[in-house]
C-alpha cells in the first residue's frame, strides 16, 4: 500500500498540471509572451515579450490561422480581431468588444463614399466640378472675395519721384519743362505763339 500511494499522488499532480496548462491557453493566447499577457482577456490576442500586442484568428471549420498584425495596445489588437471575425463569421461572430462595433472604422470604403468619374465631366469627380458659389451668386461671390483680399493687404509702397519721367516726356515733345515754383511763364507764351516747331505734331487723334 505504501508503494502505491506515491504513484497515485504523482498521477494526480500531473493531471492537475496539465489542466492548468490547458486552461491558460483558452480565450486569449496566454501561457507565453510579455508581462501583461496573463491578464489579457481578449480572444485571439497576445503580447510579445518586448511589449507589442499581436492578433490572429482561425478560419471557419478549424482552418488555418490568419495573422492580423502587430499593435501597440491590446485594445487595438482586439478591434482588429473583431473586424476579421465579422468578415469570417458574420453576425454570429463572438466579439471581444461588441459595444465598439459602430465606432470602429470600416476597413473598406462603402460604395456611397467612392467617387466615380462622370462621362459628362470628362473624368472629373463630382467634388472637383462643384463650385463654392452657385451660378446666380458668382458675381457677388467674386466681389466679396476681392474685397476681402484687398482688405487684408497692407503694403507700404515707396514714394517715387516721377518728375524726371515727366521732364523727359515733355522734352521729347518740344515743350519747356517748368519746375515746381517757377513763375516764369514767358516760355509758355512762346509755345502758344508757335515758337516750337513740334507743336503741330502734337495733335488729337480725332
Swiss-Prot record:
The keyword Thylakoid does not apply. SMART domains: AP2 (SM00380). The keyword Nucleus applies. Putative transcriptional activator that binds specifically to the DNA sequence 5'-[AG]CCGAC-3'. Binding to the C-repeat/DRE element mediates high salinity-inducible transcription. It comes from Arabidopsis thaliana. The gene is DREB2D. Residues 107-139 have a biased composition (Low complexity). PROSITE patterns: AP2_ERF (PS51032). One of its GO terms (cellular component) is nucleus. Keywords: Activator, DNA-binding, Nucleus, Stress response, Transcription, Transcription regulation. This is Dehydration-responsive element-binding protein 2D. Residues 13-40, 102-139 are annotated as: Disordered. Gene3D superfamilies: AP2/ERF domain (3.30.730.10). CDD domains: AP2 (cd00018). One of its GO terms (molecular function) is transcription cis-regulatory region binding. PANTHER family: DEHYDRATION-RESPONSIVE ELEMENT-BINDING PROTEIN 2C (PTHR31241), DEHYDRATION-RESPONSIVE ELEMENT-BINDING PROTEIN 2D (PTHR31241:SF62). InterPro entries: AP2/ERF_dom, AP2/ERF_dom_sf, DNA-bd_dom_sf. Residues 41-98 bind DNA. It comes from the Eukaryota.
